């Protein structure tokens, strides 16, 4: 016995066994009516139990063989199913006009019979059977990925077919609940998948619109979940006139061993014949020997080479430890391509001028293809970042994470480019009632979330691009504070009351500022909310660009009640240094305010990593309106006798000269006035106030 054959033991069946399964077929003189009632039962969410496979096969036999049982029994479909262990039991009832009449009279079918008695069916069209089967076929291409990806793919195909005028499906079929039911049926029913795939490949005549859709869906299902097979056969095992040659990047000994094992697994897969490209969908034997993890180096190299050739499907994750190998294979393949093209041009060019023209063209072609591929991959990476952020928010929401009653998530703004600010001093008239709630605020957000979810990529999608390194998601979600300042509007001190026109301001801001487009995809992510969250909840990004909202609204309106609110992760959120109201009474400040935040040489180094995760804690006297009734602006005297106009001086982009002079003199590590001016916009309003009050 070859000792190395121990490694192969258990990978091949030595005593093949097929589990027998009985399938009930229904045969009546009113077959179309029976089939329509089966469709109605499925659409209504009724669980047919072990009659489901038989009901689906009855639909297929009616559609493809016009319920001719003899033709079906002699067909390749019936032969394959019998070899797979299926036995057909035909229930005949010539006079039956209802599905109820053909169900066997057995005790365990009594709940099904009761459910079917309440079902009313008025449809009796034969074309509805083909419509239902074509609708089921739309779920095949992404069936192995997951329900979300499969449903989104089906919806895209429905849109295409409707635009082309091929077929229109009933609206209630396109609801999420119904599509999940169909997905579950297709995922569990081997017979339905097999018949659709078989007929989609082999039906060559008698096509109607429904058969055309089925054939199109089956064509898109080929090699679904078998990306490694497709990439290795196309790019690694290169087929030439002289035979099959290995790609130069896999000619080392260790990778050669993986190639040999992979070829053995491919030979086992090829025994399935025309069904081999659908092995993952049909869950055929030997499919578990074709996982990426069994051939890590071969898989990484194959995907890198495929990406270099313009394949945008080669973004599947091959393991963190092999990501660098994939990138190296990508770079090496690009260099090899250029070298081969150069050699070909030298051979076919007749003179130097033609050679230069050809070299320039091929160089441009390679660059264009490479840039287009990277653009598509970047787009997939962005979609994944949005999906990951949404999933993280959903996890927090599901865990019921809530803040304490004395904490509210707030976002204190950075100052943007220089803007002239005028603050009108006038008496404050406190309203006795809370501001009116924003109409349909919560409903509007949920509508946006559901409408934008179609662009997400499922995390389990083998064709979705996963992040190439651990920092990808963090880098894409976190926006530096210098960028966030560019698309902020009129500077305003942080206020505790909420903006009443946030949705209108958001639309104006998005339409007038192009720099903000790159940040929009993060704003569309759903907020983490609980059922009892305040209607006044908004985030600072939506309320920064309102006309006339710089200081007046924050003074006029009382703070909202301290409802329990969720911690919102906002890329421009800053940590509080103080717990006092910026428009409240200015008292003594405890603590060393001038202590550098991040480094001893930088007085106000921006906390880009921690600011997005810290919430502000309100002072106990925050809700006391009497403490806040003051006229603004006013001249304030600091602890050391310096004066400045509050809050006007703190709203300017550049700090007052008195503050700059004091900071330069009093800091332990001397810094220049230029550095301080550069750091001033990165301070939150509270940080500026505390610095000013301690000078």
Curated annotation (Swiss-Prot):
Compositional bias segments (type: Polar residues): 495-505, 537-552
Transmembrane intervals: none
GO MF, one annotated term: RNA binding
Region Disordered, residue ranges: 423-458, 483-515, 527-612
Record Pfam families: Ebola_NP
PTM note: Phosphorylated.
Coiled coil ranges: 316-341, 372-399
Protein name in the entry: Nucleoprotein
Species this chain originates from: Lake Victoria marburgvirus (strain Popp-67) (MARV)
């Amino acid at each position: 016995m070859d000792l190395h054959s121990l490694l192969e033991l258990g990978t091949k069946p030595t005593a093949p066994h097929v589990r027998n399964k009985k399938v009930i077929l229904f045969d009546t003189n009113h077959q179309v009516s029976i089939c329509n009632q089966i469709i109605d039962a499925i659409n209504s969410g009724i669980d047919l139990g072990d009659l489901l496979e038989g009901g689906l096969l009855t639909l297929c036999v009616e559609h493809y063989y016009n319920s001719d049982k003899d033709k079906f029994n002699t067909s390749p479909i019936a032969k394959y199913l019998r070899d797979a262990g299926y036995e057909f039991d035909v229930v005949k009832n010539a006079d039956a006009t209802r599905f109820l009449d053909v169900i066997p009279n057995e005790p365990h079918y009594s709940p099904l019979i009761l459910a079917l008695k309440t079902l009313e069916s008025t449809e009796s069209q034969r074309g509805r059977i083909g419509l239902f089967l074509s609708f089921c076929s739309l779920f095949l291409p992404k069936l192995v990925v997951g329900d979300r990806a499969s449903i989104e793919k089906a919806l895209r195909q429905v849109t295409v077919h409707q635009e082309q005028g091929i077929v229109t499906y009933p609206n209630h079929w396109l609801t999420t609940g119904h599509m999940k039911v169909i997905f579950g049926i297709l995922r569990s029913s081997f017979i339905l998948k097999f018949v659709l795939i078989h007929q989609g490949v082999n039906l060559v005549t008698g096509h109607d619109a429904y058969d055309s859709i089925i054939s199109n869906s089956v064509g898109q299902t080929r090699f679904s979940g078998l990306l490694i097979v497709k990439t290795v056969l196309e790019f690694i095992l290169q087929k030439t006139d002289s035979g099959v040659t290995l790609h130069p990047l896999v000619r080392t000994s260790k990778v050669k061993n993986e190639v040999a094992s992979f070829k053995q697994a491919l030979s086992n897969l090829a025994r399935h014949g025309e069904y081999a490209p659908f092995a993952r969908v049909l869950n055929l034997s030997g499919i578990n020997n074709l996982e990426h993890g069994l051939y890590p180096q071969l898989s990484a190299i194959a995907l890198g080479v495929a990406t270099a050739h313009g394949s945008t499907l080669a973004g599947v994750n091959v393991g963190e430890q092999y990501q660098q190998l994939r990138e190296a294979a990508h770079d090496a393949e690009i260099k090899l391509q250029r070298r081969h093209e150069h050699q070909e041009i030298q051979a076919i060019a007749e003179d130097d001028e033609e050679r230069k023209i050809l070299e320039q063209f091929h160089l441009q072609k390679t660059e264009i293809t490479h840039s287009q591929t990277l653009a598509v991959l970047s787009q997939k990476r962005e979609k994944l970042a949005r999906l990951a952020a949404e999933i993280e928010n959903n996890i927090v929401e599901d865990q019921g994470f809530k803040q304490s009653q004395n904490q509210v998530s707030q976002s204190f703004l950075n100052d943007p480019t220089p803007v002239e600010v005028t603050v009108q001093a006038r008496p404050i008239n406190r309203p006795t009632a809370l501001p009116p709630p924003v109409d349909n605020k919560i409903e509007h957000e949920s509508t946006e979330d559901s409408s934008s979810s179609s662009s997400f990529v499922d995390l389990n999608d083998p064709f979705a691009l996963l992040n190439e390194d651990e920092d990808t998601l963090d880098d894409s979600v976190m926006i530096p504070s210098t960028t966030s300042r560019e698309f902020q509007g009129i500077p305003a001190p942080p206020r505790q009351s909420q903006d009443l026109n946030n949705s209108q301001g958001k639309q104006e801001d998005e339409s007038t500022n192009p720099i903000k487009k790159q940040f929009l995809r993060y704003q569309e992510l759903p907020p983490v909310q609980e059922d009892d969250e305040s209607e006044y909840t908004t985030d600072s990004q939506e309320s920064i660009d309102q006309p006339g909202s710089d200081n007046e609204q924050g003074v006029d309106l009382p703070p909202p009640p301290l409802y329990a609110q969720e911690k919102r992760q906002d890329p421009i959120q800053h940590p509080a240094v103080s717990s006092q109201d910026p428009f409240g009474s200015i008292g003594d400040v405890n603590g060393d305010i001038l202590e550098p935040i991040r480094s001893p040489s930088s007085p106000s180094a921006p906390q880009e990593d921690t600011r997005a995760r810290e919430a502000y804690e309100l002072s106990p006297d925050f809700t006391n309106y009497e403490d806040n009734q003051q006229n603004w602006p006013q001249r304030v005297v600091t602890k050391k006798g310096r004066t400045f106009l509050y809050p006007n001086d703190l709203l300017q982009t550049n700090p007052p000269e008195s503050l700059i002079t004091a900071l330069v003199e009093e800091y332990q590590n001397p810094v220049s006035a230029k550095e301080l001016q550069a750091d001033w916009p990165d301070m939150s309003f509270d940080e500026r106030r505390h610095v000013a009050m301690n000078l």
